[in-house]
Amino acid sequence: MKVQIVFFSITVFIFVLFLLSVESNTKIKIVPSFLENSNEIEDLYINLDSDSKSSEHTTSSSSSSNSKNKGDSSSSSSNSGSSSNSIISGDSNSKDAPTTSSDSLSPATPIPTDGLLSASTYVTFTGGKVLCENITFCPNGYMYSSDYACNYDIVQNDPATHRGDWNDGIKMFEDPLPKNTTIDQVEGISFTISGAVGCQVTSSATTLEFYIQDLLVLTNTTSRYDICTCGSCYVTFGTEVYKYNMLGYNITGENKFQIQVSVNSMCATTIGITLYYKPPTITPTPTITPTPTITPTPTITPTVTPTATPSTTPSTTPTTTPSTPTPTPTKSPYSGALSPQVKKYIIIASSITGGLLISIFSFVFIRKRLNSKRSGYTQIKDGKDIDTQQIKIGVRIGKGNFGEVYLGTWRGSQVAVKKLPAHNINENILKEFHREINLMKNLRHPNVIQFLGSCLISPDICICTEYMPRGSLYSILHNEKIKISWSLVKRMMIDAAKGIIYLHGSTPVILHRDLKSHNLLVDENWKVKVADFGLSTIEQQGATMTACGTPCWTSPEVLRSQRYTEKADVYSFGIILWECATRQDPYFGIPPFQVIFAVGREGMRPPTPKYGPPKYIQLLKDCLNENPSQRPTMEQCLEILESIETKGFDDIPVNNNNNNNSNNNENNNENNNNSDNNNNDINYSNRVIN
């Protein structure tokens, strides 16, 4: 009987484990296990190719220089007005300067970049500043740079007057590819030149040869003429993307770059090198559902073994009468009724098993309740899978690169439904989509957009969030029918600061990385909520939401692909403060690729607003400081905003973006000196994100 009790207890215990495994497995099915180890933050890689193509043009200008770099090749030429590209795929045997005959060049065909990622780096040319120190502005369509270098001398064959550190066009650069990227993943390459090309107007064309590790990568022939009398005035153009086989390339360190100019001359400020590579292939790990093994309780058949056999043979003696004795059977150890001892064992085992079951189920229930609570906020259900048949889709209220946004009704409430287009679905997008859903469903704050649920069944992949009737802050600022007072701006910026502080205070720290007025949504009571912090990396794939695009709100350290902290979000918050004070687009009319260079390398900032509360204007300038450690924290921004006095200031009018960048150069000097003049005693601590 003891064996029965043991088998019964083991069976009950295995059944309990089965119940727990089913509960655990149900959770795993919501998010596949191969997505749980995804990287939290990806590096920002800037693809200048699409922007640089739009800036290609041909201009005419006179030049007094007729010489070229003595290290450049002069063996290739082209007819006036023509443009061609060639690439070389073989090895070079040259040990010093690269040399390649134009007869060996084969026509190159641009490759498509669909589905490819990109990583960029820059080489800079300096040393020509003294020649153009009196220049303050450039003609329309040209940018100004304080430093540059040229491939020819001011006075022919006079090395003493050489323009800058041209050095035969040779520069070294660090590999920009992400860690663990292999050579086999690299598909193509493109180059972006910021400078003046075609200085000798008497020549018909300019031939540019690009070398990496002394191997010719690309030959570009163009018939463009730019202003070359002063290298400080320049334009930016780029090549298309061509196949690159990475011969001789050092993927773990420094590489040698060289540009050779023939037939004509050029000046350069920077040259961008962009590599295009395939994303890594991720093999999903299948989810294994444990199958419990239940051992059936064996049926024990009782065996009755008599201890003695009664004698049936009569025993007789001559002197006695024979008699048949009555047999006395021995009592069987098994009987129909359980003995008191067996009943005692059964009661004890049942009590222990029942107590264990009650304890386990109580623990699971309490753990669920504790994990779901968020102190200080109204508890709602965690974001979960939604049956799209329960959603009534209404009118379209927005459209972006992520997909279309519709006003919908779900369980009697208005919701915003973002649908992922079927043609946009791939493994990387789904992986990022799952990761960001897991992030958003755990956030609860009055100034953070509420995530309600999602559908992950293709093709109806979508997410549902709360609906904000007044739309984005950007649309409000640019609506001439809406009057905006300084008190309303103060209130909305306080709301935004509280939402960002909540994200920065999370564990681990959540950096928005895409803060802008488009991602601050407003409800019917003018309360502002931070949105799109979860899907920013998806929506930024090749996206520009305005004529200027996301770079206008991005901090200089991010544009330079450097390490960044939560102070990068503080810089973006400063641009939003500027938008509210002016009701204009930052850097209106300047192409995004020029904004990237001007903000990241030249220190350009929007012009300081001339009207508004002094504390507000000073906070705006402090947030845009070049040095991240000199920027205030979001907690300090909130404290300053709450102390601002807005009485006596008129409503902020809508501006038409005219001349809002005319004072950029003057304003840049002021911004660059902020840390020296105003904030020498401030050194905010940073939490560095690798």
UniProtKB/Swiss-Prot annotation:
<dbReference type="GO" id="GO:0007165">
    <property type="term" value="P:signal transduction"/>
</dbReference>
<feature type="compositionally biased region" description="Polar residues">
    <location>
        <begin position="97"/>
        <end position="107"/>
    </location>
</feature>
<keyword id="KW-0732">Signal</keyword>
<feature type="glycosylation site" description="N-linked (GlcNAc...) asparagine">
    <location>
        <position position="134"/>
    </location>
</feature>
<keyword id="KW-1133">Transmembrane helix</keyword>
<dbReference type="GO" id="GO:0106310">
    <property type="term" value="F:protein serine kinase activity"/>
</dbReference>
<dbReference type="InterPro" id="IPR017441">
    <property type="entry name" value="Protein_kinase_ATP_BS"/>
</dbReference>
<dbReference type="GO" id="GO:0004674">
    <property type="term" value="F:protein serine/threonine kinase activity"/>
</dbReference>
<feature type="region of interest" description="Disordered">
    <location>
        <begin position="287"/>
        <end position="335"/>
    </location>
</feature>
<feature type="domain" description="Protein kinase">
    <location>
        <begin position="391"/>
        <end position="644"/>
    </location>
</feature>
<dbReference type="Pfam" id="PF07714">
    <property type="entry name" value="PK_Tyr_Ser-Thr"/>
</dbReference>
<feature type="compositionally biased region" description="Low complexity">
    <location>
        <begin position="655"/>
        <end position="681"/>
    </location>
</feature>
<keyword id="KW-0472">Membrane</keyword>
<keyword id="KW-0723">Serine/threonine-protein kinase</keyword>
<keyword id="KW-0067">ATP-binding</keyword>
<dbReference type="InterPro" id="IPR008271">
    <property type="entry name" value="Ser/Thr_kinase_AS"/>
</dbReference>
<dbReference type="GO" id="GO:0005737">
    <property type="term" value="C:cytoplasm"/>
</dbReference>
<feature type="glycosylation site" description="N-linked (GlcNAc...) asparagine">
    <location>
        <position position="220"/>
    </location>
</feature>
<keyword id="KW-0812">Transmembrane</keyword>
<feature type="compositionally biased region" description="Low complexity">
    <location>
        <begin position="57"/>
        <end position="96"/>
    </location>
</feature>
<feature type="region of interest" description="Disordered">
    <location>
        <begin position="51"/>
        <end position="110"/>
    </location>
</feature>
<feature type="active site" description="Proton acceptor">
    <location>
        <position position="514"/>
    </location>
</feature>
<dbReference type="GO" id="GO:0004672">
    <property type="term" value="F:protein kinase activity"/>
</dbReference>
<feature type="signal peptide">
    <location>
        <begin position="1"/>
        <end position="24"/>
    </location>
</feature>
<dbReference type="GO" id="GO:0016020">
    <property type="term" value="C:membrane"/>
</dbReference>
<feature type="glycosylation site" description="N-linked (GlcNAc...) asparagine">
    <location>
        <position position="250"/>
    </location>
</feature>
<feature type="region of interest" description="Disordered">
    <location>
        <begin position="649"/>
        <end position="690"/>
    </location>
</feature>
<feature type="binding site">
    <location>
        <begin position="397"/>
        <end position="405"/>
    </location>
    <ligand>
        <name>ATP</name>
    </ligand>
</feature>
<keyword id="KW-0325">Glycoprotein</keyword>
<feature type="compositionally biased region" description="Low complexity">
    <location>
        <begin position="296"/>
        <end position="323"/>
    </location>
</feature>
<keyword id="KW-0547">Nucleotide-binding</keyword>
<dbReference type="InterPro" id="IPR000719">
    <property type="entry name" value="Prot_kinase_dom"/>
</dbReference>
<keyword id="KW-0808">Transferase</keyword>
<keyword id="KW-0418">Kinase</keyword>
<dbReference type="InterPro" id="IPR011009">
    <property type="entry name" value="Kinase-like_dom_sf"/>
</dbReference>
<protein>
    <recommendedName>
        <fullName>Probable serine/threonine-protein kinase drkB</fullName>
        <ecNumber>2.7.11.1</ecNumber>
    </recommendedName>
</protein>
<feature type="glycosylation site" description="N-linked (GlcNAc...) asparagine">
    <location>
        <position position="180"/>
    </location>
</feature>
<dbReference type="GO" id="GO:0005524">
    <property type="term" value="F:ATP binding"/>
</dbReference>
<dbReference type="InterPro" id="IPR001245">
    <property type="entry name" value="Ser-Thr/Tyr_kinase_cat_dom"/>
</dbReference>
<feature type="binding site">
    <location>
        <position position="418"/>
    </location>
    <ligand>
        <name>ATP</name>
    </ligand>
</feature>
<comment type="similarity">
    <text>Belongs to the protein kinase superfamily. TKL Ser/Thr protein kinase family.</text>
</comment>
<feature type="transmembrane region" description="Helical">
    <location>
        <begin position="346"/>
        <end position="366"/>
    </location>
</feature>
